[in-house]
Design a protein with these regions (language model features):
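A short, gly/pro- and small-residue-rich
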Residues: 47-58, 147-150
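Active-site neighborhood of phospho(di)ester-bond hydrolases with catalytic His/Asp-centered motifs
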Residues: 5-7, 28-34, 52-57, 73, ...
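Conserved catalytic scaffold of divalent metal-dependent phosphoesterases
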Residues: 5-14, 59-149
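Short, conserved loop/helix-junction motifs that constitute active-site signature segments
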Residues: 23-24, 44-48, 153-157, 180-182
Length: 227
């Protein structure tokens, strides 16, 4: 399965003819946040692939104007094309009273509240996050620190891959690194865009099928569900 992952910076080349070919080649499109609703909605016009998104720390407008035709994975495990995708958007809290920012303790509580959902799903295959892991591709300033609680989450559930954004290439002073690893699991900064192919060893057969617990606002295909 060929996955196009997006984050933070709209990619100009995706608006042209080359971009249309890139979109058509994708089996699945994932957004790690901080992208305009119109940008994600545009993608759905040129691809039959599902577009799955979470919130970045600047995406407070998604509540009133969500991306049309896209699957919202924020705070849930969603089953799309046999992949169990866990969505944990937002950044570390560096301003008060912003609903897309969380303290370390708040993010840890979010994960704890998902335990029952994770059990029903039998785990997850992809962690779709906005922020990185603490100490792994994050930065020293408060606004761009990662979350420590992502480490035990990955080690316990052993997903295929984690995608995130938030740390822009322009912020990294020539030290930008897209692909890192935590406990043997690839951790990829998808800022701008990144194309990823699932390993041949992955199989959707382990993903359980269950009825959606609530209706998804999406152009969902059969089998695309909330757990």
């Amino acid at each position: 399965m060929h996955i196009l992952v997006l984050a933070d910076d709209p990619v100009q080349r995706l608006w042209g003819e080359y971009g249309k070919e890139t979109l058509k080649a994708a089996d699945l499109i994932l957004s790690c946040g901080d992208l305009p609703s119109s940008y994600l909605s545009y993608m759905t016009c040129f691809t039959s692939a599902p577009v799955v998104y979470i919130h970045g720390n600047h995406d407070t407008g998604y509540e009133t104007r969500p991306p049309e035709g896209c699957v919202n994975a924020e705070g849930h495990v969603v089953l799309v094309k046999g992949l169990r995708i866990l969505g944990l958007g937002g950044s570390i809290r560096y301003r008060p009273d912003v609903p897309t920012m969380f303290s370390e303790e708040e993010m840890a509580r979010r994960i704890q509240k998902l335990r029952r959902e994770l059990k029903r799903a039998g785990g997850f295959d992809i962690l779709l996050a906005h922020s990185p892991i603490a100490g792994l591709g994050d930065q020293e300033d408060l606004a761009h620190r990662g979350f420590e609680c992502f480490k035990p989450l990955l080690s316990e559930y052993r997903p295929v891959v984690m995608f995130h954004g938030h740390v822009h290439q322009a912020y990294s002073a020539g030290k930008f690194q897209r692909v890192r690893e935590w406990d043997g699991i690839p951790v990829i900064n998808a800022c701008g865009s990144y194309e990823y192919d699932l390993p041949d060893t992955w199989s959707p057969s382990g993903a359980p099928t269950c009825f959606a617990r609530r209706k998804m606002k999406s152009r969902a295909e059969p089998g695309d569900e909330h757990f």
